């Protein structure tokens, strides 16, 4: 049997496990829901082992490994923390942060839920289970991930017609395919182990070094180009896959257009580290990571959510990035990067630190402006609009190589688009 088919079968098994648990168990069946995490984790573990030993294409390994690991995180959120059920058609627990603990699950709701659960058909329950298993942003619902980009920035309530939606996304797929195919042969992959060597990851500590280990202007240019190129390719690949799935799902009447809001925000939103991660970059893993971080912050560490304390917000944010770091670390392992060499955890935790630094600087500037009692001049406004993107590029240029150089070292020029 084709190895890729076996890998996809493992992913389908994980999706089916989530669908069965969410669709056919009530919120009180917590033991059964917890037991469901065992086959999820078992599948992800064997997926990683299988990919490392049987799948040679690094692109396939990256996609399949990331999908399998993320389905474990999604299961923990949907089945255990948020406890989605068919009977309520919604999450029934606030442990994952989706709903206030006193706004749902009243006795009346539970009685109605029991009746609905008893009379529902097998296919309806299974369909609902798969709907949740395949969701990660919940657009057009009360539980949508914060700050999802609208279809039209000037008119956030606008939803395109089906024909316009299909035309736009089909065009995007074709453009991305052509761009990725055209850029796949650029550069010499034989140079990658040297150009992206681990000793070239440090930046500021090498600025004053005049010896062979020092950094040159040429290397800085290569570093900036590699980092920007990496994130541009990530953007293109993710948007391509998302648009392709959207075209298939809407064409076959599996879902409505309103469920496929853009996966990325506007590039103009990327004016700093916080806006890059919170508003521009895709939010596909946000709910799963936030759910686990919410539980740890407010139910294990016992921070008060209603206090609005800076410490609670920053602990929560750091944990969100840390969970994302775990996810990306295991995804790296599926690509053949040894666990100890993956820089994913360090990179993602650094993003939280970058946001804290950004917040602190903005607070100082705001306080100075208030104390001076003067508005922003034209020059200050121009500098303000430029400083955000410059700061973001500088931050990513410093922090990204610690993570992405590990995979770039191993890049042997295998095209992302194999045809």
Curated annotation (Swiss-Prot):
Record's catalysed reaction(s)? 3-O-(beta-D-glucopyranosyl)-2alpha-hydroxyisomotiol + acetyl-CoA = 3-O-(beta-D-glucopyranosyl)-2alpha-acetoxyisomotiol + CoA; 2-deacetylfuscoatroside + acetyl-CoA = fuscoatroside + CoA
Alphabetical UniProt keywords = Acyltransferase, Glycoprotein, Membrane, Transferase, Transmembrane, Transmembrane helix
Its domain of life? Answer: Eukaryota
Q: What is its EC number?
A: 2.3.1.-
- Which residues of this chain are annotated as glycosylation sites? 2, 112, 169
- Primary place of residence? membrane
Tagged with keyword Transmembrane? yes
Q: Where are the transmembrane segments?
A: 4-24, 62-82, 230-250, 314-334, 337-357, 386-406
Q: Where in the cell is it found?
A: Membrane
Q: In which pathway does it act?
A: Secondary metabolite biosynthesis; terpenoid biosynthesis
What Gene Ontology terms describe what this protein does at the molecular function level?
O-acyltransferase activity
Q: Does the keyword Acyltransferase apply?
A: yes
Quote the biotech use from the record.
Fuscoatroside and some of its derivatives show interesting antifungal activity against Candida albicans and Aspergillus niger.
A GO cellular component entry from the record: membrane
Q: What does this protein do?
A: Terpene cyclase-glycosyl transferase fusion protein; part of the gene cluster that mediates the biosynthesis of the enfumafungin-type antibiotic, fuscoatroside. Within the pathway, fsoF catalyzes the acetylation of C2-alpha-OH following the C2 hydroxylation by the cytochrome monooxygenase fsoD. The fuscoatroside biosynthesis is initiated by the cyclization of 2,3(S)-oxidosqualene through FsoA's terpene cyclase (TC) domain, leading to the formation of the fernane skeleton isomotiol, harboring a fernane triterpene skeleton with a C8-C9 double bond.
This chain's protein is named: Acetyltransferase fsoF
According to its UniProt entry, this protein's organism is: Humicola fuscoatra
């Amino acid at each position: 049997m084709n190895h890729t088919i076996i890998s996809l079968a493992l992913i389908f098994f994980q999706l089916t496990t989530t669908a069965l648990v969410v669709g056919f168990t009530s919120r009180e069946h917590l033991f059964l829901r917890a037991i469901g995490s065992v086959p999820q984790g078992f599948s992800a573990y064997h997926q990683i082992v299988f990919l490392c030993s049987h799948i040679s294409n690094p692109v396939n390994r990256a996609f399949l490994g990331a999908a399998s690991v993320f389905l474990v995180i999604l299961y923990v959120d949907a089945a255990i923390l948020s406890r989605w059920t068919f009977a309520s058609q919604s999450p029934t627990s606030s442990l994952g942060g989706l709903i206030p603990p006193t706004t749902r699950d009243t006795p009346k709701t539970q009685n109605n839920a029991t009746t609905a659960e008893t009379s529902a058909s097998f296919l309806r329950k299974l369909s609902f289970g798969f709907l949740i298993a395949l969701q990660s942003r919940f657009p057009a619902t009360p539980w949508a991930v914060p700050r999802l980009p609208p279809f039209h920035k000037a008119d956030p309530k606008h939803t395109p017609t089906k024909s316009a939606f299909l035309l736009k996304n089909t065009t995007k797929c074709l453009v991305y395919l052509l761009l990725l195919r055209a850029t796949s042969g650029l550069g010499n992959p034989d140079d990658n182990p040297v150009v992206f060597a681990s000793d070239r990851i440090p930046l500021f500590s090498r600025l004053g070094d005049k010896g062979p280990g020092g950094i040159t202007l040429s290397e800085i240019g290569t570093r900036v180009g590699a980092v920007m190129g990496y994130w541009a390719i990530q953007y293109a690949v993710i948007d391509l896959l998302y648009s392709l799935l959207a075209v298939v799902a809407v064409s076959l009447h599996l879902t409505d257009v309103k469920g496929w809001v853009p996966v990325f925000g506007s590039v103009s939103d990327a004016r700093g580290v916080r806006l890059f991660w919170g508003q521009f970059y895709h939010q596909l893993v946000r709910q799963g990571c936030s759910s686990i971080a919410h539980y740890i912050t407010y139910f294990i560490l016992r921070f008060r959510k209603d206090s609005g304390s800076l410490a609670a917000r920053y602990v929560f944010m750091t944990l969100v990035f840390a969970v994302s770091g775990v996810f990306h670390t295991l995804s790296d392992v599926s690509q053949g990067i040894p666990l100890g060499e993956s820089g994913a955890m360090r990179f993602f935790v650094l993003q939280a630190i970058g946001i804290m630094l950004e917040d602190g600087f903005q607070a100082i500037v705001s306080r100075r402006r208030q104390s001076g009692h003067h508005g922003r001049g034209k020059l200050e406004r121009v500098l303000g609009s430029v400083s955000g993107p410059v700061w973001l590029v500088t931050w990513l240029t410093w922090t990204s190589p610690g993570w992405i150089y590990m995979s770039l070292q191993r890049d042997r020029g295998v095209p992302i688009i194999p045809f």
